[in-house]
């Protein structure tokens, strides 16, 4: 079987067991290719995380491909039909951990850049790559640290295309032009432990907190807008008790998350939660963790360039969406960059037997190359 450039590079990347935060030479493989076509290569290691900043050109505007080489753990190896780090093609599908999320997109970015530079050696502005091995993990020493470094030296990204698997039913049918914010909390409600037969001598934190939790679940936080659905509140964990059937627990711990729109701020959500908990007279502590601000890229140069490229290559009228979880776009958008996520189908990401359609790889490369043409061709 004749492998295209994108498929060949995908296979090479997929053979690397780069479980987060280990890069396992993926960035070196990419950097070697990029260096040959004139990119200045700058590895940036923070803690146990490898990052790559590669740039061709010194002027603006700057078009940046962003993505991650790390993958999630494989899960039970005996549940896979083939070794997750020995990629296989079966029935037109490429199987391997990271095939959809997101090593095939990384390969497409590199090949698209090689082809574009060959046609336009004196292109406008700059092309850059921002690649990390810490997207699937804590995301503390990855993209956010690279962005901080670039900001300190006043290096600005104009347009950023993140290669996350955005497509749903066919390649390019969905691109993400924003993401909701994510706010987490751990709530600890204090009670008084006692015997279930003597409730008057105890305080049951489950009973005391239940009305407040019910109100939090029923609250309408906002109604969303044309770009974002309404803010969502979800309880993810509840723990209380000793395991015994005759002991009233002394404390309750609840973990919850907001996925929130641009109609409300994290501070407003915190304030309303405290008001509800205080109204119910709870004795509590709460620890907040803001893991991502919401961002939105309105229709403009980058969105137009992507929609035009997708239509030309696939014939698909793409839909803009802000659904799904967080991505590293949340660290790039606050710098003022236009950010868009565009990649392969996401149906099997993080799953056993993760795979992608082989016939999508070359069209994805063509889309990426056309976006470069639309923005940086002289």
From Swiss-Prot:
Q: Name one GO biological process term.
A: L-arginine biosynthetic process
Say which enzyme class the record assigns.
Answer: hydrolase
Q: Which UniProt keywords apply?
A: Amino-acid biosynthesis, Cobalt, Diaminopimelate biosynthesis, Hydrolase, Lysine biosynthesis, Metal-binding, Zinc
Give the EC number(s) under which this enzyme is classified.
3.5.1.18
For this protein, what does the record note about how its cofactor is bound? Binds 2 Zn(2+) or Co(2+) ions per subunit.
From the UniProt record, list the coiled-coil ranges. Answer: none
* Pathway in which this enzyme or protein is active: Amino-acid biosynthesis; L-lysine biosynthesis via DAP pathway; LL-2,6-diaminopimelate from (S)-tetrahydrodipicolinate (succinylase route): step 3/3
Residues where Zn(2+) 2 binds: 101, 136, 350
Q: Which reaction does it catalyse?
A: N-succinyl-(2S,6S)-2,6-diaminopimelate + H2O = (2S,6S)-2,6-diaminopimelate + succinate
Q: Show the GO MF annotations.
A: acetylornithine deacetylase activity; cobalt ion binding; succinyl-diaminopimelate desuccinylase activity; zinc ion binding
Residues of the active site are: 70, 135 (proton acceptor)
Q: How does it assemble?
A: Homodimer.
Q: PANTHER family of this UniProt entry?
A: ACETYLORNITHINE DEACETYLASE, N-ACETYL-L-CITRULLINE DEACETYLASE
Described by its record, this protein's role is as follows: Catalyzes the hydrolysis of N-succinyl-L,L-diaminopimelic acid (SDAP), forming succinate and LL-2,6-diaminopimelate (DAP), an intermediate involved in the bacterial biosynthesis of lysine and meso-diaminopimelic acid, an essential component of bacterial cell walls.
**Which NCBIfam families does the annotation name?**
dapE_proteo (TIGR01246), PRK13009.1 (NF009557)
This protein is called Succinyl-diaminopimelate desuccinylase
Q: Which gene encodes it?
A: dapE
